[in-house]
């Protein structure tokens, strides 16, 4: 009987982890939510304006219309990836989100010239694939444009898509 309870408990634990992984996966899927309504809901006016500026910048670079990826990521375009581990999925080619008081721009972790560009950006912090910017007024806006363009080039090189004729 005790073994049965442990087995059931272990099975429930595995089911919970699978459910959490599934829910986590669903958060990064495109949604039907309007990007403009998402941005309009940002309480701080300067952050709303910064988000609109990033939409214009990324639209110009990607030549794609924005769409919501999950509840908070504004993404442009998409690509399919598959890791050596076998894990695969879809992601936005270019994306940003408001995280608290900062804009987070998502870029590839390593591409030629990334560190040089980040040094020219202005006031920011970085994570592995994130660039945290408190205010766009504190950065040279030509740099995020170049960062996004180079990140997209690197992504397309690393994950060629079958429908892009080798691009």
Label the predicted regions.
Residues 2-167:
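Charge-dense, helix-prone N-terminal extensions
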């Amino acid at each position: 009987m005790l073994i049965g309870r442990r087995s059931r408990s272990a099975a429930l634990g595995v089911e919970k982890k699978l459910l959490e992984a599934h829910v986590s996966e669903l958060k990064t899927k495109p949604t039907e939510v309007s990007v403009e309504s998402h941005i309009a809901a940002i309480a701080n006016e300067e952050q709303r304006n910064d988000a609109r500026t990033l939409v214009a910048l990324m639209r110009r670079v990607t030549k794609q219309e924005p769409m919501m990826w999950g509840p908070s990521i504004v993404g442009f375009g998409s690509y399919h990836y598959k890791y050596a581990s076998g894990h695969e999925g879809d992601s936005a080619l270019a994306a940003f989100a408001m995280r608290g008081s900062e804009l987070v721009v998502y870029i590839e972790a390593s591409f030629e010239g990334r560190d040089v560009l980040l040094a020219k950006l202005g006031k920011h912090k970085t994570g592995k694939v994130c660039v945290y910017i408190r205010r766009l007024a504190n950065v040279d806006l030509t740099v995020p444009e170049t960062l996004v363009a180079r990140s997209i080039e690197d992504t397309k090189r690393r994950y060629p898509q079958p429908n892009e004729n080798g691009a």
